[in-house]
Amino acid sequence: MSGGPDSLALLVLAVEAGLQVTAHHVDHGLRPGSAAEAELVHAAAERFGAAFRSHSVVVEPGPNLEARARKARYDVLPAGVLTGHTMDDQAETVLLNLMRGAGLDGLAGMTPYRRPLRALRRSDTVALCAELELTPLHDSSNDDPRFRRNRVRHELIPLLDDIADRDVVPILVRQSNLLRDDAELLEEHADRALANLETNVALAAELPPAIVRRAIRKWLRNHGYGRDELHPPDAKAVERILAVVRSEAVGCDIGQGWRVTRRNNRLRLHSPDS
């Protein structure tokens, strides 16, 4: 919990739903007001009968700060923790992923798992806090234009609303839900294709490229490459491996000292230490 309206609303609704709730606060050490945030979250947890736990992580300033802070946060939080992402957060994520050139998974946005507020708007959580006379903390970093998400939130989405002459957030979220259904279907086919990469590459080569690409990404992660969300399997590397699967190359480098080869109708991944 950050002490903002979304996380406070999540706390209240989780308690009202009869769940045994523990409010977790993570201090990233990035701004001086973090102690006040922890106090507010602790007080809110006590008011609504929830337990409270505080965590501290170290996140050095520098590039990719948002992603590194998010990873550090999830590393200390328990598995299955609920988050206060709303419909607005989903729309922002879809647009951010679109600008990064993400594929189907990225355009499907965040998974619904552990996000019980995904059908609510940010205005709903603000209204709930006002009704309960809760005063959320305002994170000044959410207004900092150096962070791309903030520009999407404060500049791009209002511009799209104006151009479309309607609220685009529900439209973006509806499209992401449709794309998630497509992505899940492809994932099922990729699971079946995965075994062929190590046992019979020729069979994998006959499958549609969309399925083989997914199988390649899963295969890489299963073998220790690209597990870190900050460094997922690179799209160009996947295309090079696809060429190996199709016998257009006998091997390829995929970065960071890793290499993929095809031998005896099997795909092999070689780590920098092998």
Where in this protein do the model-derived segments appear?
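Internal, active-site/partner-interface "lid" segment
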Residues: 142-148, 168-180
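Core alpha/beta nucleotide-donor-binding catalytic domains of modification enzymes
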Residues: 1-158
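Inter-helical turn/loop segments and adjacent helix faces that build the functional surface
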Residues: 159-171
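Amphipathic alpha-helical interaction segments
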Residues: 93, 151, 155, 170-174, ...
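Amphipathic, well-packed alpha-helical segments that form the structural scaffold of globular domains
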Residues: 130, 134, 157, 161, ...
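Alpha-solenoid HEAT/Armadillo repeat architecture
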Residues: 118, 161-162, 205, 221
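AMP-forming adenylation/ATP pyrophosphatase catalytic core
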Residues: 1-6, 25-28, 57-59, 72, ...
